[in-house]
């Protein structure tokens, strides 16, 4: 392995921030991988909830885009990207829509916490560029995503899932099926 040459563009970019960005890239790719697993679980012929599948596939693409945005930032700031192995999802069988939404909510809260810690690090290292980047591209979107998932969990519970397969089907058809026209 060759050592990376020093960057000409690096300025006020602490090594701790560079390392934290690489960890965040890994976490975003992990989240994308989890959502991809969820998507294709709901696409199975014995589950057949196509709008859950579409919803989680969209989430997977968003998380991958977040990772790519961080990679672009790393290069712009003169940092070096060091990719790590992406952990496989904790499960392959997501059981039902409520369980998957609860797992997704927990995942988004974890990603948000990591971003908040990255923002604190950037503040501590006096890096206004990184603070602005995180605020502009991530924090508000995370809060919206957490709220949306929380609403989905609440509605699925109120409808009586997972005991009621009909409720899950109706949520898939009417809530997730209508989200395309609202976006």
From Swiss-Prot:
SUPFAM superfamilies tied to this protein: Ferritin-like
Subcellular localization, as worded in the UniProt entry: Cytoplasm; Lysosome; Cytoplasmic vesicle, Autophagosome
Modified residues (Phosphoserine): 179, 183
GO terms for biological process, alphabetical: intracellular iron ion homeostasis; iron ion transport; negative regulation of ferroptosis
Catalytic activity field: 4 Fe(2+) + O2 + 4 H(+) = 4 Fe(3+) + 2 H2O
Modified residues annotated as N-acetylthreonine in this record: 2
Ferritin-like diiron domain ranges (all copies): 11-160
Amino-acid positions noted as binding Fe cation 1 in the UniProt annotation, renumbered to this chain: 28, 63, 66
Binding site residues for Fe cation 2: 63, 108, 142
Keywords: Acetylation, Cytoplasm, Cytoplasmic vesicle, Iron, Iron storage, Lysosome, Metal-binding, Oxidoreductase, Phosphoprotein
UniProt-recorded Gene Ontology molecular function terms: ferric iron binding; ferrous iron binding; ferroxidase activity
Any Gene Ontology CC annotation: cytoplasm
Enzyme class: oxidoreductase
Superkingdom, natural source: Eukaryota
A Pfam family hit: Ferritin
Record text on subunit structure and interactions: Oligomer of 24 subunits. There are two types of subunits: L (light) chain and H (heavy) chain. The major chain can be light or heavy, depending on the species and tissue type. The functional molecule forms a roughly spherical shell with a diameter of 12 nm and contains a central cavity into which the insoluble mineral iron core is deposited. Interacts with NCOA4; NCOA4 promotes targeting of the iron-binding ferritin complex to autolysosomes following starvation or iron depletion.
Protein's name according to its UniProt entry: Ferritin heavy chain
UniProt organism field: Felis catus (Cat)
């Amino acid at each position: 392995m060759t050592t990376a040459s020093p960057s000409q563009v690096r300025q006020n970019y602490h090594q701790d921030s560079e390392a934290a960005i690489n960890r965040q890239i890994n976490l975003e790719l992990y989240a994308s991988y989890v959502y991809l697993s969820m998507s294709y679980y709901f696409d199975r012929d014995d589950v057949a909830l196509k709008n859950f599948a579409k919803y989680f596939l969209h989430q997977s693409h968003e998380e991958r885009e977040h990772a790519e945005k961080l990679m672009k930032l790393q290069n712009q700031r003169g940092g070096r990207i060091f990719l790590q192995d992406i952990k496989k999802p904790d499960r392959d069988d997501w059981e039902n829509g409520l369980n998957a939404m609860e797992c997704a909510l927990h995942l988004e809260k974890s990603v948000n916490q990591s971003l908040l810690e990255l923002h604190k690090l950037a503040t501590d290292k006096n890096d206004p560029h990184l603070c602005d980047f995180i605020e502009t591209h991530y924090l508000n979107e995370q809060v919206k995503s957490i709220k949306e998932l929380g609403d989905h969990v609440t509605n699925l519970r109120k409808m009586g899932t997972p005991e009621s397969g009909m409720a899950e089907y109706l949520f898939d058809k009417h809530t997730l099926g209508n989200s395309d026209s609202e976006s």
